[in-house]
A protein has these predicted regions:
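Extended amphipathic alpha-helical segments enriched in small hydrophobics
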Residues: 244-281
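FAD-binding core of flavoproteins
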Residues: 99-248
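Intrinsically disordered or highly flexible coil/loop and linker segments, enriched in small
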Residues: 89-96, 100, 220-221, 269-273
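Internal helix-loop-helix
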Residues: 2-94, 140, 146
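Short, well-ordered alpha-helical packing segments
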Residues: 81-88, 119, 126-128, 135, ...
Length: 281
């Protein structure tokens, strides 16, 4: 109850109270509460809480699908609203997936020596599409119910198969996950490690997600070949996600500053000018 105003919001889709991580921003106040929520959770967990990317992806795709439909006569916005209503009603965790492995940065997706360096459509049917490729550096994927996939860069004519956005279950047929390690992973298995603050059970898992002819039904597709709108998703996501970093990283920074100040007190050096200068900076 203490943090209910920060952690929940009223859905513009259903009128119900929802987890703010599933909320679609409607005002400046929503954006302020979002970043305050993220700073609070950074302070409380001192770790990545893994739902920010999905929230930022949803807000980018929500507005972009509306504009795509207006320009192209598609039904992507209707698809997304239906999907996201289910997300809100069930409080599903959603991983936002943007980063491709990319290959030669000087070439567009369709000009790469290996076509799978960017996730793309390999077959279209009356019922949907099959996609192949990979998304890298997926921090919250293992702990999410769904993945919301977006293009990673602006597209141009010839890149139509790469201008694709969709959602699917994180364990859909054809998906393989490669788990990355962190240098301090084994600390979680040591005895008497309760001194560590943070999410010791679920924090820090990062995967490379490989899609091998994964089928995406039509009603889960939010962009499919409309190249000029790929960049719009990227730009809007980037704006939302930069704001998120201004919350979560600052919250974790608060913990680091506090821990450093405590270490200074315990070492008897808290009044040293160079220690105070570093803490103030």
């Amino acid at each position: 109850p203490q943090y209910e105003d920060l952690m929940t919001a009223t859905s513009n889709l259903t009128g119900k109270k929802v987890n703010r991580f599933t909320h679609l921003h409607q005002s400046t106040d929503d954006l302020i509460k979002k970043v305050k929520m993220q700073r609070l959770l950074g302070q409380k967990t001192a770790a990545c809480f893994q739902r920010c990317v999905g929230m930022d992806a949803a807000n980018a795709v929500y507005s972009t699908t509306f504009e795509t439909d207006e320009a192209c006569g598609t039904k992507y916005h209707e698809n997304f609203v239906k999907f996201w209503t289910d997300v809100q009603n069930n409080d599903w965790g959603v991983d936002g997936a943007m980063t491709d492995v990319k290959g030669d940065r000087g070439l567009s997706p369709s000009k790469q020596a290996d076509p799978d360096l960017f996730l793309h459509v390999v077959e279209r049917t009356a019922d949907g599409v099959y996609v192949t490729g990979a998304k890298a550096h997926q921090t919250g994927y293992l702990n999410s119910h769904y993945v919301l996939v977006m293009p990673t860069i602006s597209m141009r004519e010839g890149d139509e198969d790469y201008a694709i956005s969709f959602a699917c279950p994180t364990d859909a047929d054809g998906i393989t996950l490669i788990l990355g390690r962190q240098s301090c992973d084994t600390r979680k298995t040591e005895e008497h490690n309760d001194i560590d603050v943070g999410n010791k059970v679920y924090g820090g898992h990062e995967v490379l997600v490989i899609f091998d002819r994964v089928f995406i039904p039509n009603d889960m597709i939010f962009l499919n070949g409309e190249v000029k709108f790929a960049g719009m998703i990227v730009e809007r996501f980037a704006g939302y996600h930069r704001q998120s970093y201004g919350g979560c990283k600052v919250g974790v920074g608060d913990v680091l500053i506090g821990a450093t100040a405590l270490a200074g007190e315990m070492a008897g050096s808290s009044k040293a000018s160079h220690v105070k200068d570093k803490l103030i900076e």
